Regions:
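Short loop-to-beta-strand entry elements in the cores of soluble alpha/beta enzymes
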Residues: 127-136
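Beta-strand->loop->alpha-helix junctions that form or flank phosphate-binding loops
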Residues: 15-18, 135-136, 148-168, 184-188, ...
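Membrane-proximal helix-turn-helix segments that form the acceptor-binding/catalytic region
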Residues: 119-128
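Rossmann-fold NAD(P)-dependent oxidoreductase module
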Residues: 3-7, 148
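Nucleotide phosphate-binding/pyrophosphate-handling subdomain across enzymes
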Residues: 71-72, 76-81, 88-99, 103-108, ...
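Short glycine/serine/threonine/alanine-rich loop segments
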Residues: 10, 130, 152-156, 206
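Extended acidic/charged loop-beta regions that coordinate divalent cations
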Residues: 18, 61-110, 142-180
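ATP-dependent carboxylate-amine ligase catalytic core
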Residues: 7-93, 111, 140
């Protein structure tokens, strides 16, 4: 989503976690991470308030991201939840679109030990009269999302699974909405991620053309996701069973 919007001329802020190499990666504008100076400036300004209310690490970084995006006057911000959704620090926002990907068992001691329990937490990011896009997945999980969407009068759309998925040494190729795409990331799940992103883009700005989306996806790079180090070595940071699969 971020890469497509940037290729379309938007000034985009993105907040993700965790970081791979250094903290600055979590907060980026126009593809560039926040500077050390920007981090120090925020902490100097906010330290008294942080100490007063006892903010957690993630709460502090979330506010840092919001403040940085405000300073940089971004056109759109992409905010990834840290853990779950319902009680996540990021869930104070009023999004223009909510997006939920695949549900798998993770942080079970906090979110619950079944897909349905985790889905209830994830459904917390569905907001009143706000479009929500979700992965095609188990009916039990989709039912939970649908019930929350109905309660919030939110239009829920289930992203279709791409067709003709082919994974080879160059990445992943697939067909979505009768159009062909290629991404340099490896795995059928990356085709599904891209398909979901395309659906979100078409909802957010239907004027963005196929050529722009196609070119942007070909330039997507996410280090640590089946990253090819050399001819026979791949590097991946998956930390649970579903991620490895």
């Amino acid at each position: 989503i971020e890469r497509i919007l940037r290729y379309s001329g938007y000034k985009v802020g993105i907040y993700t976690s965790p970081h791979l190499f250094n903290f600055n990666e979590r907060i980026r504008v126009g593809g560039q991470p926040i500077s050390d100076k920007g981090i120090v400036s925020f902490l100097d300004h906010a330290s008294e308030e942080i100490d007063k209310i006892g903010s957690t690490f993630f709460e502090v970084t979330t506010v840092m991201a919001f403040e940085y995006f405000k300073q940089k006057k971004v056109d759109i911000a992409i905010i990834e939840t840290g853990l779950g959704g319902r009680l996540d620090a990021t869930n104070v926002i009023s999004p223009v679109i909510s997006v939920i990907t695949s549900i798998s068992i993770d942080h079970a001691e906090i979110l619950g030990d079944s897909p349905e329990q985790i889905a209830l937490e994830k459904a917390g990011i569905i907001k009143d009269k706000t479009p929500v896009f979700v992965y095609q997945q188990d009916n039990e999980v989709l039912d939970i999302f649908q019930k929350k969407a109905i309660a919030c009068n939110a239009d829920m759309k289930i992203s279709r699974i791409p067709k003709n998925i082919n994974v080879n040494s160059k990445g992943t190729q697939f067909t979505f909405n009768n159009q062909d795409y290629a991404i340099p990331l490896f795995g059928s799940h990356q085709a599904r991620n891209a398909g979901l992103a395309i659906d979100v883009i078409n909802q957010f700005d239907p004027h963005i053309k196929y050529d722009t989306i196609h070119k942007a996806l070909k330039k997507v790079f996410w280090p640590g996701r089946m990253q090819k180090i050399d001819q026979r070595v791949f590097y991946d940071v998956s930390h649970n069973k579903k991620g490895m699969e």
